[in-house]
């Protein structure tokens, strides 16, 4: 947790303890800042080597927020994580990767790289000493080349930017993924068919769901995320009106088996939004993300800011990850291997950990209630 004053740590810990929330695993560090859009200014992390060591890619950030642009360097100094500078402007809210060479971003990245402001340098103490080097502006082909070599080696997909998304051009306002096989995408109501962004969103959907995943199959559509309404539950009159607030359910944070979920009405004692239309949308989200516990937060104070929960948080990956990659099984599956008594559905997975895998098991359910397991060999 970045704080700008050392005394803030005690205040935050006390507030968490009063709320009955665990905080013993939290680490605080003091550093200067300009804002709180940590998704965008924070590092994009990766694993490397046989021991799954953690590294950080430090992309250029908004030069109007130089202290925030320093965040990856500060993390490097505080925690010793290797930090690699990249002379490409790219914000984390416009980054969706699958961990196996697939990357999605928007054409806003092209616009952000037309200037000549490069990497910064300073004395490491006084933010007033911050200065920027100059660089050449990058063409769209230059941008795609860099991204394709760093994170999108298998496939780099760059989709058109929406016109009325709050001004960021970020894909995390309407696109999400929980695995390497599929996407979730927000869907505008049919009443908005005349909007320019409606057509762009439909086109982006066609682009994404015609791409091939790691297993050579088209990405699966996990379902349409609902579209937020006004406070009274009515729709937006124009896309310009919507763009002034740019509410979104997609901009949530997935943390283990919990989802920190934006909503747009007061949260009741049951943890759900109190407005009927808002509650109905969250209930739809719960069905789209089975197995997750939702923690709803009324984010109306962020209306017009261009972001929500996902935008103000940034994770550093686990230092001992278990990586599981497998082809998902969707819909009705016909048994393919006949047997006198049983019929089987073949399943395989790539499972890795630096300490090795002792006994992998597949857990499955036929009715969504009773779970069974079988050893993978």
What are these regions (language model features)?
Residues 1-325:
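The feature marks the mature, well-folded catalytic cores of soluble enzymes
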